[in-house]
């Protein structure tokens, strides 16, 4: 194995108590289709999928600030993949730039569209590829929508999980436009995830 450089633990972290995590199962699933995670990627996935004694997410809000090109997308991709398949979650993935949304969409949709992955392909209901309206729909009721942010983002819609990628560019107006989309979640187990890059 090649030698790893760089720190594998957060410089600064606040994580509360939790009963258990689905992180290990999510990693096993994701690693069938993408590379195995680095230590810190696994840790972040464990935090996102941590549960309390009621089997609800222990952390309703999760945030990560990390320099560019360090692998944030692996953990988030694995988080979405597991949420869609295992829990049938309705997920809204938002970012500031279209190419970021395109990249995440292509990475997540590829395993479902590959007919050699029979179990995943059978679970797939539809893939929507129209720019600005990209989405993956599963037969278990789960779906994920990929979009760039606007000041009227997601009004009138309901999601279980909202992800703000490129959150360092998130405006108050954009956040307000999607603030209440998880309040009507039928699972009553909502989560909001912020991913950002620290300023130079």
Label each region the model flagged:
Residues 1-200:
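Phosphate/NTP-binding elements of NTP-utilizing enzymes
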